[in-house]
Amino acid sequence: MNRSASHRLSNSRRWQTAVSSVLCALVLAGVVSALSPSTSAENGAIDNAALRDSLAHAALLRDRAVSGSRAMAIVTSLTTEVGPRLAGSAAEARAREWAVSIMADLDLQPIRTEGFELSAWQRHSEHAEVVMPFPQPLAVTALGGSVSTSAAGLTGEVVLFESLAALRAAPREEVADKIVYVGHTMQRTQDGSSYGYFNPVRTAGPSIAAEKGALAYLLRSIGTDSHRLPHTGSLRYTENAPQIPALALSNPDADQVERILADGGGLVVKLLLETSLIPTAQSANVIAEIRGHAAPEEVVVIGAHLDSWDLGTGAVDDGAGVGITMAAMALIKEAGLVPRRTIRLVLWGAEEVGLLGALAYRDQHRGELANHVIGSESDFGGGRVWKLTADSQTDAGDQLVAHMADLLAPLGIAPGSDKQPGGGPDLMPLVSAGVPTLRLHQDGRDYFDLHHTADDTVDKLDAASLDQNVAAFAVVTWLAANSDVAFRKAP
């Protein structure tokens, strides 16, 4: 027997001893005493003895994670050794090489990459300034996908709209040959719901303005901070329609623009922006698995996206998710646990530019999506998890989620009643294919202070919060994978 095999066997024996102790504690605590005698086979239940063992294993995974996981080390490595990882760039390719290497070091086998093509946008330079009435520079950043100005830039009068709805309603003559500025009132929320409401200001606004004859488009950054650090993010030009340069102002600079316009004397701004588009570039998803011993064709998917924007180092979005999910899977592997089903870790490529990796994954795996049991993604920074929800469609699935919630309660995580499909942005293509999802809701009250800015760096993350996330992911992933419970109704 080689040294590593002997070490794993020794770990396995220690783990089984620990499982027995934890199982006794769980029984005394009443966590496993309320198991129903049986659940219908149609719902895919497992027997109570197996469930008790799974719960004991999950409790140990939870406790090991909160005592210190690899999550912070992983995200620190990614953001230091690779840095920003713009979709389709050489840096994103280096990130894939990094991911394969780290997965191998963690013995997360087998490992593969699944490639796809995309058009790769690049930022080169950006500048904005007030020409009149009060000359001064403005802090701006180009939206992802924006076209350039001419080499000489463009100068125009700014017209203000307080909302996207106001721009939609404006007559063409109010917009034509002007630089459009759209404001908004994004609110700080725990669940980030305000982002979804105001996101169309960024994604749809440029084309609405262009169709009305605007020269360029400015918006207040979709963020909740008060720093002169503008927030980038993708726009979506309408196909076969005019395209105009589009930039985000930092929130303090947006305040400045609104103050100047409030005086009623007009505002003239000059913009200079250089970007480029590589028509055909490469990206890929990076995948690692722990193969199931009883039903390896059944898959529990967890993951995060590997790409990032180019302003910061992509620590919060989504290096944290990469670290959390990799560390959770590594914890299961290190424990010597082999689930009934396959656990598949997917690090999606090119999420920031339209969920391209997630769409490619759906298309490349159409033939097996019926066997995707459930999925969950970490893509909301490194804040502590505070709520668990799942869109289970079966009684047995609901019961297993309730057991997950019992084990997560000591982490400060409460069960939620919302069954809205979701689980994370990269899971939406799978949701459309009928795959159930589970969501570990993170506290996002400060997430949009940093999101898509130069301030998205690893010093903003807290190791203890990441460990709590790892604990939660390890628990739910293990329990879903080491079960034959169905979360979706039989066809």
Feature-to-residue mapping (PLM):
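Extracellular/luminal Protease-associated
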Residues: 89, 139-245, 313, 415
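Soluble metallo-hydrolase cores and metallopeptidase-like ectodomains found primarily
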Residues: 56-57, 132-172, 235-315, 327-330, ...
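Metal-dependent peptidase/peptidase-like ectodomains
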Residues: 135-137, 244-247, 254-255, 295, ...
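Second-shell loop/turn segments in exported
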Residues: 58-65, 80-91, 156-161, 190-206, ...
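His/Asp/Glu-rich mid-to-C-terminal helical/loop segments that flank catalytic regions of hydrolases
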Residues: 330, 448-491
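N-terminal capping segment at the start of a domain
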Residues: 49, 53-89, 229-234, 307, ...
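Short helix-loop-beta-strand segments that form the rim/entrance of peptidase-like active sites
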Residues: 73, 330-356
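Noncatalytic luminal/extracellular "stalk/propeptide" segments of secretory-pathway proteins
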Residues: 47, 53-60, 76, 80-179, ...
